[in-house]
Amino acid sequence: MKSITTLLPLALAIASTQAYCPPTGPVLPPPTLPACPSNLTSTTRRALEKISSSTDATFSVQVTSRNHTFFSHHHTGTTLADIGTAEVDGESVYRLASVTKVFTVLSLLLQEGVDLDLPASHYVAELDNVPGYESTTLRMLASQLAGVPRDGYMFDLTSGLSPEMLKSLGLPSIEPPANVPKCDAVSQGQAPCTRSEFFDVLAGAGTTWQPGQKAAYSNLAFIILGFAVENITGTPYVEVVRDTILEPLGMTSTGYSAPELSRLVVPNNSRDFAVMDVYNYNATGGLYSTPNDLSSFLRGLLNFDLLNNARTSAWLKPQAFTSSPLNSVGAPWEIYRPTSLLPDNRPLDVYTKSGGLPGYNAYIALVPEFDIGISVNVAGAGDKDYDVVRAIFSSVLETLVPGLDALARTQAAQKYAGTYTSGSGNTTSSLVMSVDDGPGLKVEKWTLLGNNVLDIVAMLNRAQGAAAIDVRAYPIGEDERWLLVTEKVGGDQGAPAVYAGTCDGWFLLDQVRFAGLPTDEIDFVVKDGEVVGAVSPGLRQQLTKS
């Protein structure tokens, strides 16, 4: 008994003040999806058909796994112009608007030797002459933390509204300062700013927040990032994106110029904007693409075709909080953590980027829990565009996630659940694993040389026996290695207010090793795709599945 108690102190320590505190990310291996899982997607299709019947907008939705697009839905509304495509499908071209920002950041990440935490002026020398930007970094720009004004003169009221309209709104009749270049409002027929003019505008615009302080959405920040890409590579920004992202991923219908009209989705109220070159705004919102190409892009991210696993994972991490614990800001991800989609009410990490231009809305999303990517393109939704694209995206998640979660549980139960044993009599060791409504694999029973390991874990954590604790295994994501986390059944109801609802399991992982090996790890042995055994490295157990 003594040897076991020295192996396990705190290695499986109680880690939560709520019911479940699994590590973030997938709690079971993502499910393997068939090519056409109609039983999984039928509810999603019905939900989108209901939206189709209530909107005049045109939209396309695709959902892809790492291997293939397993769901597509296209609806041709009544607000398309008589030019452009007459019926949308996977090869129809939409404007992506600010979804472009993901491509801009990725094009920077793909450059060797770029330090995102150096002052941005190291890569864009003009910033030396812009007050307030001395400490601004590329990472701040990419994460909406630089305090850069949102839009400059492009959407200034004086550029888009007549003097009569401004007067009717009660605004004074004034002209912008003489030193503010009237450029880049291309939708109003103005010429694009030169680089010199752009930085003149920036120098006179001040900042929204102090750099590094708080998130504030900015399109101008990504124009600066586009300039940085050009300076770093010595190549025009649009060519860098083409050479480093579009061509490697086979995105042949994606680019910064309007395609032939027969493929372009053209809303009736946005005919001019459909084909408009946005010049400096290319790096913030200039891309055109198809649903099929977006699925190729999302598969490229899921398969780490451009960035490896470690760098992709780091890229997805939050960079700034919002005032809600359910969403945060990345580079440039808009990260949501809904708690209502999974049966155990734990947060589901959803990494999104939205976009909107007159007549167009777009969404892309990665859901690592299930290894899927989602794209939504909307055209011609009018004043309700924001509501429509969010309703579509939310409907896809709400209807797909329960089925994906159930499939992941079913497949995990078939593969891992069961009894693992070795020895006999007093030397018997065993491990019983199951899949229930909670996260991960539940450890139902665990013995070592006839001793109840779970009783020992409970004793070390001042719990009243094995029934008072819950031990679960979670996948590390490689080589069938899993980590164990122990929690009190029902959570810690007596936690002080500051710690109520928090999760501290990350403090305790791999805390105790025995003779160099972890005591909180279980490795499954797989042969010909079937699990045939389990190994506890720290306890030196080698068990065979019954």
Briefly describe each language-model feature range:
Residues 152, 156-193:
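Core domains of carbohydrate- and sulfate-ester-processing enzymes
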Residues 37-41, 54, 93-101, 113, ...:
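Solvent-exposed, acidic/flexible segments
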Residues 20-77, 91, 275-546:
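Catalytic loop of the DD-peptidase/beta-lactamase superfamily, centered on the K-T-G motif
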Residues 40-47, 70, 99-100, 116-123, ...:
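Stable alpha-helical elements in mature extracytoplasmic
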Residues 61, 67-68, 95-119, 141, ...:
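Alpha-helical scaffold elements that line and support the substrate/ligand-binding pocket
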Residues 1-19:
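Fungal secretory targeting signals
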Residues 90, 95-99, 111-166, 204, ...:
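Active-site helix/loop module of the DD-peptidase/beta-lactamase fold
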Residues 82-83, 196-208, 266-279, 344-345:
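The feature captures the short pre-catalytic strand/loop hairpin that immediately precedes
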